[in-house]
């Protein structure tokens, strides 16, 4: 498959680093574009444009790290911080707005009493994505 536009949502886990490296490999083949986004969740009591400094600083550090990882592979990644009430819908909205061909997400292996759990965001993205989704397990 050929992917010209790849969206890589990140949360700051080790799986994100592997996901960005995989995105670079996929994008290099077609000289595609990669966007890495971090979604800052805004509580309903606050306006959507509220500045939550610690969360913004965390997002900037994570996205800077993604840029460095891509540069190590001689590739450029555009980064963006999104403000939203919920992460899943923000990722889908971004994918639609940018017209991406692929959403690539790094997921941590979580076990709960012997069962595999993907949390809330990944199932939402899988169900509502306008394009293929690749999950890269750490």
Residue ranges and their predicted role:
Residues 24, 92, 123:
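Active-site phosphate/pyrophosphate- and oxyanion-stabilizing loops and adjacent acidic/basic residues
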Residues 1-50, 69-73, 78:
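Small/aliphatic-rich secondary-structure junction motif
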Residues 1, 71-103:
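Structural beta-alpha unit
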Residues 51-61:
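A short acidic, glycine-rich active-site loop
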Residues 124, 128-137:
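Short, acidic/small-residue loops that bind anionic groups at enzyme active sites
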Residues 105-127:
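Glycine-rich, Arg-bearing micro-motifs that act as flexible, cationic patches
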Residues 38, 106-108, 137-138:
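Short secondary-structure boundary segments
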């Amino acid at each position: 498959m050929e992917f010209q536009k790849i969206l890589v949502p990140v949360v700051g886990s080790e799986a994100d680093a592997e996901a960005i490296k995989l995105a670079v490999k996929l994008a290099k083949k077609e000289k595609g574009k990669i966007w890495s986004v971090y979604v800052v969740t805004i509580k309903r009591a606050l306006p959507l444009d509220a500045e939550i400094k610690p969360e913004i600083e965390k997002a900037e550090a994570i996205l800077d790290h993604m840029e460095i990882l891509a540069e190590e592979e001689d590739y450029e990644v555009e980064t963006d911080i999104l403000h939203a009430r919920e992460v899943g819908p923000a990722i889908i909205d971004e994918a639609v707005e940018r017209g991406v061909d692929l959403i690539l997400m790094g997921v941590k292996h979580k076990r709960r009493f012997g069962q595999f759990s993907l949390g809330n965001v990944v199932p939402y993205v899988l169900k509502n994505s306008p394009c293929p989704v690749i999950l890269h397990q750490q």
